């Protein structure tokens, strides 16, 4: 059964609300949880089900970071002579016009693939899904499409602008809208679908002929009255990473062991795979004080780290205090610096005795290689206050 399925993963355009982290990389390749990237979750979901033909469809964002991370796909068992992993540009160019060369290349991939059915995921939605069970339920339903959703509480605080779905008594999707923070509880779409390749190509071709091409979720919503869509309820942890705030929330949530076990498949056995880098163990010196934090290999810690995430190669000097921070790869936090609710992107230096603080709702982001100092921080705060 699985051999008849391929997977499509939409990587998501670089959302404006998360732009400080996507200036130099695709949204799907943003580091999370210390040693992982956002794309790892979608890729692992499909390969854990045995799918071995995966197409990644991206917008017009920078792809160097993504291609460096994925490589030939060996970590996900996708480095293969037949099938494997492929990266494509979407059919819209920078001016949002249909690009004929991209259309031809993308369609060739679908026609060349021998699988007759498709699992579609979107990388900005993070979860650990039993794709095998999803496929089984889809085939048992006899419907054209199966759409995955989750009953979400506090939908008035999270999942802004995510798709919401209305489901009738026969478990059929009868409405697709958008979550605008009006309801406390909502059925949120995971932007995950199962359908036949024939139906997907029909939706794509019809949209191209109409000059209204967009991602599959919007094509399905546009054609909802003529489609028979089964609803599949997902009950695990779900995070939509479409803003800096939600990115920060996800990292902080990973400090909760119950959530961490769910997302990384500790009990289910559905592991999350990532690119492995050979680095030495982290060195905790005598003055180090680390509490409730995720620390990757290759770090050197002399200061205090509380409720924080540290990626590979971070150096935390003596008398540093980090509280609720996300420190990405190869950052150097110098002696006496105090940071709270701060995201520090790769290759940054925070100078001695710097004091950087923000709120959990609006964490401060130090962009890649900025070598931040107090004057820059004060100028930013003055700008925000006077705006």
Regions found by a protein language model. Give the residues of each.
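Left-handed beta-helix
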Residues: 1-11, 198, 207-387
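Unchanged
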Residues: 1-253, 366, 384-387
């Amino acid at each position: 059964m699985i051999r008849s399925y391929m997977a499509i993963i939409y990587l998501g355009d670089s959302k404006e609300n998360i732009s400080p982290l996507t200036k130099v990389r695709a949204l799907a390749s943003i580091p999370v949880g210390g040693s992982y990237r956002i794309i790892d979750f979608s890729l692992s979901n499909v390969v854990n089900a045995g799918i071995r033909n995966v197409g990644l469809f991206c917008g017009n964002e920078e792809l160097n970071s993504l291609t460096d991370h994925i490589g030939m796909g060996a970590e996900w068992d996708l480095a293969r002579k037949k099938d494997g992993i492929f990266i494509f540009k979407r059919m819209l160019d920078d001016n949002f016009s249909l690009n004929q060369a991209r259309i031809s290349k993308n369609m060739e991939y679908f026609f060349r693939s021998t699988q007759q059915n498709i699992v579609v995921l979107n990388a900005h939605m993070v979860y650990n899904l039993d794709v095998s069970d999803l496929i089984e339920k889809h085939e048992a339903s006899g419907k054209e499409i199966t759409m995955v959703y989750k009953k979400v509480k506090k939908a008035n605080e999270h999942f802004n602008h995510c798709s919401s779905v209305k489901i009738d008594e026969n478990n059929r999707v009868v409405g697709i809208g958008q979550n605008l923070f009006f309801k406390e509880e909502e059925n949120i779409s995971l932007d995950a679908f199962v359908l036949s390749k024939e139906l997907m190509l029909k939706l794509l071709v019809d949209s191209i002929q109409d000059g209204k091409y967009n991602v599959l979720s919007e094509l399905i919503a546009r054609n909802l009255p003529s489609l028979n869509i089964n609803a599949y309820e997902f009950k695990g942890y779900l995070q939509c990473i479409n803003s800096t705030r939600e990115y920060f929330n996800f990292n902080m949530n990973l400090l909760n062991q119950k959530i961490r076990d769910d997302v990384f498949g500790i009990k289910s056995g559905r592991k999350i795979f990532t690119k492995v880098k050979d680095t030495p163990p982290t060195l905790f010196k005598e003055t180090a004080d680390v509490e409730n934090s995720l620390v990757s290999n290759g770090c050197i810690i002399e200061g205090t780290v509380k409720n924080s995430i540290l990626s590979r190669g971070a150096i935390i000097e003596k008398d540093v205090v980090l509280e609720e921070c996300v420190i990405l790869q190869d950052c150097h936090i110098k002696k006496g610096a105090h940071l709270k609710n701060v995201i520090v992107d790769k290759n940054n230096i925070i100078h001695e005795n710097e004091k950087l603080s923000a709120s959990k709702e609006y964490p401060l982001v130090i962009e890649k290689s900025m070598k931040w100092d107090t004057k820059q921080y004060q100028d930013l705060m003055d700008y925000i206050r006077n705006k």
